[in-house]
């Protein structure tokens, strides 16, 4: 909450919100800790903690014992530092040379894989009289960022030349198909990465942290654990694949809304843009104040469901920017202001990001990450609830009588 902003009544916001259960996240973290033992854990909180809200999630994970936090961008690292986070922060995606000052000024550990990154970081460290810490990113086979494993010795020479302004404290890579235990390429990547690390050591570089294991590898590939692990999606309650061994995590985020309008339409009446759905009977239709700007994929139109009074209600017509319509004909008593579960559980039914992803031909990661910025996050913990909204400051500036 911004300085000087008072707590606002929850009903001042549109009745669409996400609940983030920080106790569930703590239990997921403990399940990972039980799996890997004393190994340090780098909790991945990039992309606004997969849509859950990076600041509050990072605070909870730091309290749970995460030694490291992983982000993609320097800007994400700066946000965490300025919010008081003290854990070590790794920039998994590296940085642009022009951001070298930002990296050092906020005590961030940068991934490096380009010579100009070393030059910029070394110059910035020299101006400050400090030592920059880096992790070398190695491409062991995923083919995106990173020094190709066979070229590690050549890059090692650049790292040695950059000492003492730059010290390599870690080396890491990323797995391409660890979510499929039958895929032999994971073993190929592990071997390639180990070979690259040995080549670094022969050049006189001895990083303390060697890491490769993502969520899938934590579950089913112990040879990839090495000296640190990097859980991502399992922190948020979703195993990366049904092909992996069972793992005791539970979804952290629920997405909820309320019915704001109900009407009965006659057979032959169409709904929404493009008239993609037409009633074939007398139908009760409920309108929900949630749309694709809030994160619902348009592909859910005429495919997906929500839960109303613990029962599935089909989405009818196209998802609009701000509105979604559902058929509640078969749900007796469904009425105005009823709570609607978009993601979550009710009445023994569960709708998860995995189910929504299947309807939308995508993956749970995308469903979670696309949750809209205008959706308030309500953080639930033992100490109560905390509401975080992009509109908080604007609403708090209203005359006091308006918000009380």
Show the residue positions of the predicted features.
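Active-site-proximal beta-alpha core segment in soluble small-molecule metabolic enzymes
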Residues: 9-12, 16-20, 24-27, 34-211, ...
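Active-site anion/phosphate-binding pocket segments in diverse small-molecule metabolic enzymes
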Residues: 1-26, 30, 34, 40, ...
